[in-house]
Amino acid sequence: ASIFVNTAVSNEIIADINELSFPLGVISLAVLPAICEEVVFRGIVMTGYKKVSPFVAIMISSLFFGFMHQNLYQFSYAALTGVFLGFLVYFTNSIYASVLAHFIINGSQVVATKLALMDNSQAIMESLKEPLSKSDI
């Protein structure tokens, strides 16, 4: 069960993502989020709180990053990833390092998802559509 997002909505998102071609999936789920999210969370938020302390800046930007991902599982994973990315920026003094790491994390998930769905894509898409027809969306 999800705190912020209905599971049927999550299933619909997965089904939509599966419809993307591999290059479009990499661009829309790995390249663009890596650049945009890092500019916002490590570039703007973390830099803004750095005057308080680097640790506080990393923690606040990580919490915002976690909340932006919308459900409890994603929050936990994203917040911890945000801490890693924040320390990466802090120790390298470069947002490029966190953009690259973010791209590798998201890109590897796109590749893994596409590989996992290759053999079973039709069966998986049908199982995802079943809860959608029974949901209250």
Question: Where do the language-model regions lie?
Answer:
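Hydrophobic alpha-helical transmembrane segments
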Residues: P23, I27, F55-I60, F75-S76, ...
